[in-house]
Amino acid sequence: PAAPEVPRALHADLLLAGQSAIDLEFLAWLLQSPAAATAPLAVREQQALLQLDRLVADPDAHAHLLPRAAAVVPPLLARLRDPSTALSDLSQLVARDITLVAEVIRMANSAYYRREEAVVELGHAIQVLGIEGLRNTIARVVLKPLIDARGGELLARSAKRLWEHTDRKSQLCAAVARGNGFDAFDAYVLALAHNAAWSVTLRTLDTVDDQAPWCVGIAFAAALARRRDHLLAVIARQWQLPGSVVEVAAEVGQRGLAADASQPVLHLYAGDRLASSLCNHGGAR
């Protein structure tokens, strides 16, 4: 006999329970702190959440959330997203920046693109990546410093792991979006911005003056995830990301990664969950 259909409300509850477990494991992995699922919100955690709430509610603070080259990032992302931008145009852009050259060649030699022979020349690397791979690589180089930005002890300790998660997540989100007929570049940039919100979150946690260790429980993990989603909407506006990305970010900011969300939000959800699982069980320990 066919299995009974799970009511939508119950399905959402089951999804939320699974999401909470992954959020807890991920936060413990990111902070390199032991997880205690039932840990309550202690004084230090409550102070951190209050500071994040004040940050989200303060428009004057939004311009200083993350470092940003105001005259560079928005027009560059718009150019990358423009379908009329030719591969030759992007190639010229890359050739002018040694950091971009190195990253393009590195990506062309990654497991995703690897060929039988090593790629050592820029022209060959660009042929291997194609226009979509090149767009993603340029966006990655431009936005990575915004995620790796300097902070206190906690952010410094977590930066390497945060970028590992970000790198996996952005590529997974792009792949999921592409497979469902949506814009892969929008999904890629949205994932980068979503994890940039973690940088802001960790920097805020670093400002909490308390010597007590962090209590990493489900309640704290879920509360941080909600505030990360609120911050995503702010960051998308501040960076002047493409309009479609800002709209999706606003939805995430209002409703989180909901089970009944729009398709672009579900792509972000899928990439985030899978990247977290991969990091929790296969990343650095």
Question: What is each stretch, according to the model?
Answer:
Residues 1-206, 214-285:
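Conserved alpha-helical "signature site"
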Residues 211:
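Catalytic or ion-translocation cores adjacent to nucleophile or general acid/base/metal-coordination motifs
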